[in-house]
Amino acid sequence: MLVKKTLAVAASIAAVALTLTACSSGTPAAPSSSAPATAASSPAADLQLVAPGTLTVCADVPYAPFEIEDSSSASGYSGFDIEVMDGVAKKLGLTLKVIDSDFDSLQSGTVLVANQCDLAASAMTITEERKANIDFSDPYYDSLQSLLVKMDSGITNLAGLAGKTLGVQKGTTGKSYATKSAPKDAKIVDFPSDGELWPAIQAGQIDAILQDQPVNHTHEVADAKYKIVETYNTNEQYGFAFAKGKKLELQKAVNDQLKAMHADGSYDALYKKYFG
């Protein structure tokens, strides 16, 4: 950080010479009252960050439209979650760094407790079970679950999966809903992420995918051979996740900046960009 210093100009040439001599000898001048605040008093000073000056965020990638690999982005990633986090980071005077992480290790809190990142931004639903291990930000997105099938599969609802194979992502609320609601003779298969789920249905390894509606919608838009046949209102809200009891100041700072993004319209602009 550069600190501007003001040197008084003396009335005589001799005094000017003395002033120049003092500067050249390295004697520090007192900072002026208009100098910027030091790092110790900056908004990010007490956030206990993994790396100073950086907001380190763990996310399970890909999970479009929330987390997307993007070589054109400074962080290497884009998507709704990532861009919201970038907005938060900028408001805190920080640089965003994104680490690709397994979702199950995020929702269990394992990666967060290990202090590998400051928080998780990964389309994570706030649940009472997860609250036992992690702290959440204020909700930032309302979501539905959905069922994606191949257009010519003949499957029109969850009941139509009797005797068939249903793909879900491990550790998700989609898996929980499938376990409770799918036909008893449906085979439910876990996958690490959407990066494996989507190729699996394309290859005919599974008959359907049950997961968050925005993600399945991305697939039906990308390939007209697939469609969402049902959505399920499970009253889910997403939150950003923090190590339990360890990042309270950061949690508050993120909540404050989310409110600021709503107030200045930047959140709404991102929402419109990704969800219309």
Where are the language model's segments positioned?
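Acidic, polar ligand-binding/catalytic clefts
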Residues: T95-G160
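Extended ligand-binding regions for polar small-molecule ligands
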Residues: I82-K91, T165, T172, F240-F275
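Bacterial lipoprotein signal-peptidase II cleavage site
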Residues: L20-A37
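Bilobed "Venus flytrap"/periplasmic-binding protein-like clamshell domains
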Residues: A64, S75-K91, S143-W198, A208, ...
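A ligand-binding cleft/hinge motif common to bilobed small-molecule-binding domains
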Residues: A123-A132, T179-K180, A203, D207-T234
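Extracytoplasmic small-molecule ligand-binding "clamshell" domains
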Residues: S42-S122
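Periplasmic-binding protein-like
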Residues: Y141-V149, H217-K259
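Sec-dependent bacterial lipoprotein signal peptides
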Residues: M1-T21
